[in-house]
Amino acid sequence: MPLVPLEHLDEVREELVKARKSRHRRLLVITGDDDSRLVTTALDFIYNVKDLLSGEKVLYTYHAFYSDGAMRKELFEKGVPRELSVDYVSYHKLDEVLGRTYAAAVADLVNNLEPNDLGRVMGVVEGGGLYIFLLPSFTRLLETVTRFQSNLIVPGYTDKDLKRYFEKRFIKKVMEHQGVAVYDADNRYWVKKFGKTPSTPYARPKPVLPQKSKIPVKVFNLALTQDQVEVLKIFEHFYAKAEKEKLVFVLTADRGRGKSSAVGLGVGWLAHRLRRAKGKCKVVVTAPAVTNVQEVFRFSAAVLDLFKHKVEVLEDESGMITKLLSKGIEIEYVTPLDVLKAKGDLLVVDEAASIPVPLLFKMLKRFNKVVYSSTIHGYEGAGRGFSLRFLKRLKNEEGVKLYEYEMSEPIRYAPEDPIEKWTFDLLLLDAEPCEITEDDLSLVSAGEVYYDAPNEEELFLKNEEELRQFFGIYIMAHYRNNPNDLGIMMDAPHHFLRMVRLKNGKIVVSLELASEGNLGEDLSKESAKGAWLMGNIIPDRLIKHYKILDFGNLRGIRVVRIATHPSVMGKGLGSFALSRLEEEARRNGYDWVGAGFGVTYELLKFWLKNGYIPVHMSPEKNPVSGEYTVIVVKPLSEKAKRIVDVIAKEFKQKLLGSLASPYFDLEPEVALLLLKSTPSFEVKVNLTKLQLARFLTYAWSDMTLENCIDVVGIMTRLYFLSKKKPSLSELQELLLVSKILQAKSWHLTCQELNLSLAEATSNMKQIAQIFSKEFLGVNSEEEALRYFFLRMDDLNEGVSA
């Protein structure tokens, strides 16, 4: 006997029958505080539609690290109809099944309502399928501290300080949307029914195949949509040799449009065709994570199987495909950074919007045929900012033949799916900034803008249009966004928002900020010993690396993210936002404002222009962006100024000694900017007579640099540390950074600085002579001559100046 009344069961069945006709999905949210009732209710609903699900897979996802989560999973497993095939997957392993398609998915969200989990799971169910969410009662949900939220409670805050706007937004959106129902398992009643949903039958249009093509019909037959056929037709162009110009394909789509599988079909055919033409083919595949490219590999393998290739599939320890091997064919995943060392006939860059534009162009330099694909809206979406940042610049590149295509038809379900609409709305996956008109540009030019502190409850729960403007700027401007960014913004007690608006109210700059510091003695000591302090990134790094406990007592604001509307960039709005933030911070007794970011020349210049001082750089590059993370701080109080001055001087000395390793591959321009923006101080020349003799023989005679590079290194460090220094050109300073401080070969130095060997060696000799005059007071070969011929009696003293 089912726990749920029969009429309630039939309502879900009728709704699912209707959904199957229209190839749309439904979401049933079951709430309850009794675990047994919660699971039994879910099973009752599943039993009543089991004939609609039989023969197809069902996903059950849960939090394996919670004993009650494991217990609910066991209850479900014992009660589920035997004829259903169920995959039980813990959330931390969900990436492993993202390429699979399910008829239904049960998501246990009792322990953790995490935005990323929702973003990932909402794409796996096919049209006509059912999602079931298991949740505590909404009252208890707003009192429970989830696993996601527990990581947001940083020192100085308690669970009572959690803002809980994400949970409130979740409840609001569940109650607003059609196709979503809420059932109270404890009291057995509908909190909300599915509402009016379309029941128009949907049949996917049969793709129209090309009359003539190098690609056989059997490959085209694997394409499910016309979009996928069009992508394959573009791949046909990539069979030609890239002789006079590079071949580039930029493919974009919302999530769930079959983008990666279409690329896989094209890669499989091209690998087969090139192998037949020239005996071998190597395809390099990259993405921020190997999980992003599983569909590329699966569909490439399917096409190779069509052509009777014996394919060996290599997987990593987590079961992710990393390589396909066949006779004369290799399709391999490499990390974005390692692409710069790889070679191949074709490069495929999936989720390209998550990789910085400079790195994408470095990849293009290395390969003659490149496919860049990226999600516009969805879990890994980057909005249309990718097109703005990348395509605009790509179109200005000479020697590039560019193909573009945007896919629109969903693969797993019909267009206008209500559950896709709900997901996009809840997680702001399709948020875009406001449109900027000529009148708006006039307001910017006239300085008619203002700094605003929004009411966050109003913004997150009521002012939907303003929230979409605010968050849309981040999607448009930043490399990587995921739903957890939104969750942190909405729930973290130490995070707060500011914005710059035009006089007419439009949002043009978005700032997400975090209060940090005020740690006290004990926490500061823990950090100094190596403990990781949650939510205090700048104090934690500075105390860890410089051991000055006093910094932990200061209060600061970290700029988590600052982004300007793309249509009004370069007009001083970001700097205006920072200046107003600093004024607000001073009024409220803060000691500093700071930021951490993946360092590029342009970004560093922005922060330096606004008076921020570099104080730390990570020793490792980010594996996706290929950038080092730099921390900058602007002291506001006198105490902060004293501490930051000491730390910045130490950072400068540390950097001078670290450019050969670990910062060997840091761009010389960035290194130079860091060195010139940190404090200089009084230093003395301190050379032995023999060091002096070698240096002067190099400067004024015929000794080679290699024979005195140790002394040139001393003099170079002296130059960058010293307050009183001679005037060198920027090229000469870059030469010192690359050749001396980073210890690069002449070949690499000349390549980086676009110099001939003769120009580089001549400039280095000039630098040595300038150092000789300014630091040592030796102005010519005649004056240096007395150091060329030494006796033992001359060696008693060193040289100080």
UniProtKB/Swiss-Prot annotation:
Catalyzed chemical reaction(s): cytidine(34) in elongator tRNA(Met) + acetyl-CoA + ATP + H2O = N(4)-acetylcytidine(34) in elongator tRNA(Met) + ADP + phosphate + CoA + H(+)
Source superkingdom: Archaea
Binding site for ATP: 228, 256-265, 412
Enzyme class at the top of the EC tree: transferase
Domain N-acetyltransferase: 457-637
Subcellular location: Cytoplasm
InterPro entries documented for this protein: Acyl_CoA_acyltransferase, GNAT_dom, NAT10/TcmA_helicase, P-loop_NTPase, TmcA/NAT10/Kre33, TmcA_N, tRNA_acetyltr_TmcA
Keywords: Acyltransferase, ATP-binding, Cytoplasm, Nucleotide-binding, RNA-binding, Transferase, tRNA processing, tRNA-binding
PROSITE patterns in the record: GNAT (PS51186)
One Gene Ontology biological process: tRNA acetylation
Protein name: tRNA(Met) cytidine acetyltransferase TmcA
Species whose genome carries this gene: Thermofilum pendens (strain DSM 2475 / Hrk 5)
Source taxonomy: Archaea, Thermoproteota, Thermoprotei, Thermofilales, Thermofilaceae
